[in-house]
Amino acid sequence: MGKVNKYIVEKINNGEKLHFTLIDPDRVNDLGKLEETAIKMAEFGTDAFLIGGSLGVTPEEAGETAKILKKTGLPVIIFPGNINCLTPYADAVLFMILMNSMEQYYLMHAQIAAAPIIKKYKLETLPTGYIVIYGETAVAHVGRTYPIPVSKPEILLSYTWAAEMIGIKYIYLEAGSGSPKPVPPSFPAIVKKYTNLITIVGGGIRSPFIAKELASSGADIIVTGTIVEEDPDKASKIISAIKKN
C-alpha cells in the first residue's frame, strides 16, 4: 500500500470523514494568492489537495501548482482531466476510468498513454472509477458521458459493483464543477451499503448542510473546488461540518 493510500485508509478506518480541496491550475492567476489559500485550507483542516480541470491545464501549470501546494505538507494528488495534468511534483494520481463515457479514449486509451509517464514520474496510483452523474456540465461534455438517472440508484450500484469486481478501490461520484445541484445523497448511501469502495463525492457542494448530508449518507471524502476559489472562509464551514459528522 502506497503512502498516500495508507494515509487515506487509516483516517477512514479511524472514523474520520475527509475533505479534499480541488485546485484548477487554469484558474490560478496569482501564485502568491494560491499559497495563501493553500495555507488557509490546511489550517481549516482539509486533508489533501487535488490538482485538475476539464480544460486548458498545461503540465507546467500543474507542476507550479503542485510545488506550492506541497509546502503545506499535505498530500498532493492529480485529478486528471487528461494526461496534460500529470506532473512529477505531485505525490499521487487518481488513476481513473470514466466509467459512463461513450468514448473509448476515456475508458482505456488515456490510461495506456498515461501509464509510462506515471511510471517515469514515480507517482503513486489510486485506482478510481469516475462516474459523472449529470449531463449539463463541462466534464460531461468533454467526456461524452451517459447521465445516471437520479431516481435509479440501482443503476449506479451496477457501475460500482463492476468497478469493485475489476479491482478498483475508489469510486468518485461527480456532479460537475460548479454544478447547480450536488450528487443525491441516495447515491453514496447505496455505494456504502453494498460495496467496500472508498467513496468520493464532488461538485455542487456549496453549503455545510449539503456536505454534512452527503458525508452522513456514506461519502468518505468530500471534494470542493469552486467554493474554495470564491470564498475560502465559507469552505472552512464546510470542512467543519464534515469533521463534526
Swiss-Prot record:
Sn-glycerol 1-phosphate binds at residues 172-178, 203-204, 225-226. It catalyses: sn-glycerol 1-phosphate + (2E,6E,10E)-geranylgeranyl diphosphate = sn-3-O-(geranylgeranyl)glycerol 1-phosphate + diphosphate. Pfam families: PcrB. It is found in: Cytoplasm. The keyword Cell membrane does not apply. This is Geranylgeranylglyceryl phosphate synthase. InterPro entries: GGGP/HepGP_synthase_I, GGGP/HepGP_synthase_sf, GGGP_HepGP_synthase, GGGP_synth. GO terms for molecular function: magnesium ion binding; phosphoglycerol geranylgeranyltransferase activity. It is an enzyme of class 2 (transferase). Its main location: cytoplasm. One of its GO terms (biological process) is glycerophospholipid biosynthetic process. GO terms for cellular component: cytoplasm. The keyword Membrane does not apply. Its EC number is 2.5.1.41. Belongs to the GGGP/HepGP synthase family. Group II subfamily. Pathway: Membrane lipid metabolism; glycerophospholipid metabolism. It comes from Staphylothermus marinus (strain ATCC 43588 / DSM 3639 / JCM 9404 / F1). Prenyltransferase that catalyzes the transfer of the geranylgeranyl moiety of geranylgeranyl diphosphate (GGPP) to the C3 hydroxyl of sn-glycerol-1-phosphate (G1P). This reaction is the first ether-bond-formation step in the biosynthesis of archaeal membrane lipids. Keywords: Cytoplasm, Lipid biosynthesis, Lipid metabolism, Magnesium, Metal-binding, Phospholipid biosynthesis, Phospholipid metabolism, Transferase. Mg(2+) binds at residues 24, 54. Its cofactor is Mg(2+).
